[in-house]
Amino acid sequence: MEWLLEDLLGAKGDMGLLWGQLTHALACRHCGSSCFQSPGNLVTLFLFVVWQIQRWWQLGRLRQLHPWCSGNMVQGKELPLLHRVAFLDHLCKQKSEVEEEGEEEEEGEDEASLDPLKPCSPTKEAPTGEQATPAPPQPSCGSEGLLKAIGIPEQTVMQPVSPSRSFPIFQILTSFPVRHKIASGNRQQQRKSQLFWGLPSLHSESLEAIFLSSGGPSPLKWSVCSSVFFNKLAFLPRSNLLLPQYHSSAQFSTHGAHTMEDLEGMAPDPQLLPPPSSPSVSSLLLHLRPFPVDHKGVLSGAEAPTQSPGTSPLEVLPGYETHLETTGHKKMPQAFEPPMPPPCQSPASLSEPRKVSPEGGLAISKDFWGTVGYREKPQASESSMPVPCPPLDSLPELQRESSLEDPSRYKPQWECRENSGNLWAFESPVLDLNPELSGTSPECVPPASETPWKGMQSRENIWVPADPVSPPSLPSVPLLESLVMGPQGVLSESKALWETMGQKENLWASDSPDPVHSTPPTTLMEPHRINPGECLATSEATWKDTEHSRNSSASRSPSLALSPPPALAPELLRVRSMGVLSDSEARCGDIQKTKNSWASKHPACNLPQDLHGASPLGVLSDSQSIVGEMEQKENCVPVFPGRGSSPSSNSVSKSHVSEPIADQSNYKPDGEAVEQRKNHWATELPAPSSLSTPLPEPHIDLELVWRNVQQREVPQGPSPLAVDPLHPVPQPPTLAEAVKIERTHPGLPKGVTCPGVKAEAPLSQRWTVPELLTHPGIHAWQWSRELKLRLKKLRQSPASRAPGPSQSFCSSPILSSTIPDFWGLPSCPPQQIYPPNPCPHSSSCHPQEVQRTVPQPVQSSHCHHFQSSSQLQPQESGRAEQGSQRGEKMKGKMVSQVPSQGPCVHMEAGVDYLSPGPGEPSNSKVLVSGKRKDKASASSSAKKREHPRKPKAGDHRRGTARLGLSTVTGKNHPAQARSLVEAPVSTFPQRSQHRGQSSQHTALPQLLLPKASGPQDQPEAGRRASDILTPRHCKHCPWAHMEKYLSFPTLKASLTRGLQKVLAKCLDNHRPLPTKSSQ
């Protein structure tokens, strides 16, 4: 402690006396040394802390470690020794035993004291080493025992000074380095042990980093090439070592070799890898990177042997590496943000190894994956960064070897990694991820030859998934892995078929960048059809996987390639939903939904039909499970950090809606759902971020909900894919129909209302809509009742009735209270389920969105609608009576209008632009209610006119999206306008709608019409909503929905005629603002 006392007290005199006294005072009465249990432990720690703080303060100003380091002090000059202090000389004079004990003791003390001092920097660490050294004079049983337990009692805890290492690591320099130097000054290779504190504190319990370095190499090289092992885990697999590694180069080298020689050999490679700009971040990122690499290496079992043939840990890693894979994936998301670009590039290199990897397995698969996968990967690599490439390349080689050794053994792990990688890769590199996904999906199917490639791909994905967005989906990785493991055996025979299809698919995927997608879907469909003929179960599953991957690749370029892939995706989705939606659907429901959302992005109603026809619904049980897994992977992959999630949520909910339709009747809903997904995808693109937030919960609940919906929907698949004529616009209705089917399982008018609500729900909420419809509907209904009461009061209150912003604001509070429900969709689903509720709910969801997207008057209408809807749900008849305020006719009209105005505007704004496409008639029905509301809320002219259509499918979503997607509504206008035209639902004055709604059928068409008339009548709708407050609307809405549901077949004709009439009226009343007339 001389140095400590000197620094603290500034005493320059003889410290021997004081030092001896301290030694005795601090000595442990049991061991005679200063241990943690010694009476002077606290004093020592305190003094040391004070000294350390002072030292840090000084170092902070000096900032130069060189003055503190003396390479001559240590045998390994590469390891800078801390500033030489008198105490070191004193220690050198003492016995080696005492010195070691004292050093260890001091190290233990330093560890204890440094633990809170984790924030100190390497410079600080150096002083720590010094500090630790003085204590050595006093033997420390505690620290010695600790070091012995660590297994490096004699090793010097020294940290090479590296500016890149910003994380606080406390170097505890014992006298052993000096003594070691004295004992073996010429020793070429010397072990340096270092106790890490701070970031390494995760392992700071007793973790000691052992640096294997040759005495000759320069400190820089040592730091670069040193392999760090905690808890004497140097012998453990690299994956374990990866955690300790903090130098990008050293980190990688650690993976490569466990010995200094290996490290030296690996040093160049790590050096090649540019460490992140931030030392601490870089260490973490590098740590994570090596981990994936190590995973790959461990998984393959070749990497470790290749780099370090003597390392046996790789053999131990099978189970351990699986764990590490999970951990690594979890960690990687966090640390991969910087590495993300490099992972992108790595896919290309991985694709190359992929080719090689199958070599061990199947030549065909190698050619297929090598050719197709490689081409596919290059796309990913285009956006990928080059940094991870070298490691990835080496990893693929190792993987190849491991695959050759036992590809099936690692396949599940590879798949798991692949899944996680895909998730990550998908999020970060859209283009790169999709091709990988395409390759990945197939990989899941083929167990043998694909396994090596999968492993490589997994590694690639692991590298590619640098984006931290995927961590949420990481949980699915184990599920996907387990799923893949099961199906792999099943898909063995379908492997060839899948490879054939996969080749086409991959080729398409490789070609798929943007425009190519349109052509590949047809090709893929053909293989799919062929495969069902050959082996529907496996080939179809395989084709689904390929198609899904294709879809994911299509999702990459959502703008250009979205249309064609969706058709294939819907088919696959239908097949999956038909075949095995229960288990894999539950697991990959979210992912699959995401994937479906991507697929739904593209209008493809006919293709799904063909697929349905081609492949038996029940054939794909096993292969579907595998495909489901693949789809899950792909679905996870398609999820973009921002919009990807949103589309996924919308698509997911839709896929759930459509997938549950396992019957032939369900095929149509599937097609519609697919189209709707398409539309949703389109919608999602404009405003995915806000939607992406809610997605996670919907994904979770949606699975259960979707199952329930499927149960409901199976008997109810009325919505026909025949809606193709309405294909562009009907898609939102189709989705709404699917939801409606789910909701109207009992055959309630909510079929109509539900579609409106469905469209009304925000993108993310759509996910929840099906869930809530099926599972959360009960509590949601309770919420709806509460909201209804509130809305009733608000409606009754003059403010709520007052048209214009005041009413909209009144509605807003309700919406605000209801918004949480919308996000959770507790209240919305109940409303959706309940015929009156859906309409009210749509309006309730709608008001917020309207507030954002529609002028205040329109908002007022929406608010009124929402209030009336919420209120009417519990009191449909009561509200109908209140509706008498405006008159029964006005009520009927407004009821139709309110659903369309409130929900439709939002639906149209949030959903229609998302889900234009086949199924328009069904959706038109939904739009009828939604558009009425939309009408009321669509005070914003043509723009909102377009919106009314979209809100139908996503009104809830819009309710939520209003918060952040008010502009999305504007974006949706074009799609909405198209939807309005296609769905024979032109913007009609609310007045006209109300008039047309005198009859329920007429009201239904008008419900659809409000969407078209929404923009024109939005101001008017606002006034009407304020006047009517939707009590009558609610009453009529349920009835209108009932009529829609009951006369859904006739609804189209009624809607057509009504739309024509209303269209004429709308054209007449559009300029007069029917709101006034309706009022």
UniProtKB/Swiss-Prot annotation:
Biased composition (Pro residues): 336-345
Disordered: annotated span: 97-145, 261-281, 297-317, 331-362, 376-412, 506-566, 637-678, 840-975
Basic and acidic residues composition-biased segments: 398-412, 669-678
Residue spans of biased composition, Low complexity class: 551-562, 645-655
Secretion signal span: none
Extent of Basic residues compositional bias: 942-951
InterPro entries (UniProt xref): Spata31g1-like
Compositional bias per record (Acidic residues), positions renumbered to this chain: 98-113
Biological role stated in the UniProt entry: Dispensable for normal development and fertility.
Protein name, UniProt field: Spermatogenesis-associated protein 31G1
Organism: Homo sapiens (Human)
Gene: SPATA31G1
